[in-house]
């Protein structure tokens, strides 16, 4: 199809090395492409391509992480925890189990019913902040990169603080 190249470009950008990743470019590509599609079948195909692209990116990034683990930690007992909303996705689970088996890691998943919503994790952060009387003003801007530790040093491009 004419739009699959756009997803391939996002895939190539994500797999330039390292463990950092962002799906912002993929989300933008999907939104741009979906606005041009007319038939339901094209939309179904795009959704399937979106799923497959995410699975492949996570497979590659997990392999990179396992390789880094091997270099820095060695051959200790290996367990890989997959949690959050991503762990509820059957296709992603299968890909990550495959990578775990290939690298002798034991995959650990919560039950699917515990994976579907990040609200519990957000509530836990709220509870922890409440316990130490750390309150934000009501005009706090929403940010997908808002760190839990506001004092941490920002790492440009990584979307994380250490």
Language-model segments: residues:
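Active-site metal-binding loops of divalent metal-dependent hydrolases
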Residues: 84-86, 112
């Amino acid at each position: 199809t004419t739009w699959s190249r756009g997803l391939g470009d996002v895939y190539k950008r994500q797999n330039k090395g390292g463990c950092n990743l962002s799906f912002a470019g993929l989300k933008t590509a999907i939104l741009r492409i979906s606005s041009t599609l007319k038939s339901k079948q094209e939309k179904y195909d795009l959704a399937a391509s979106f799923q497959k692209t995410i699975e492949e990116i996570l497979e590659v990034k997990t392999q990179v992480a396992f390789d880094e683990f091997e270099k820095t930690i060695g051959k200790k007992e290996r367990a890989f925890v997959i949690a959050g909303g991503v762990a509820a996705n059957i296709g992603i689970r299968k890909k990550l189990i495959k990578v775990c088996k290939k690298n002798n890691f034991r995959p650990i998943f919560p039950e699917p019913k515990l994976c579907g919503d990040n609200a519990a994790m957000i509530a836990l952060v709220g509870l922890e902040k409440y316990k130490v009387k750390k309150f934000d003003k009501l005009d706090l801007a929403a940010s997908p990169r808002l760190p839990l530790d506001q004092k941490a040093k920002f790492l440009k491009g990584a979307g994380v603080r250490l």
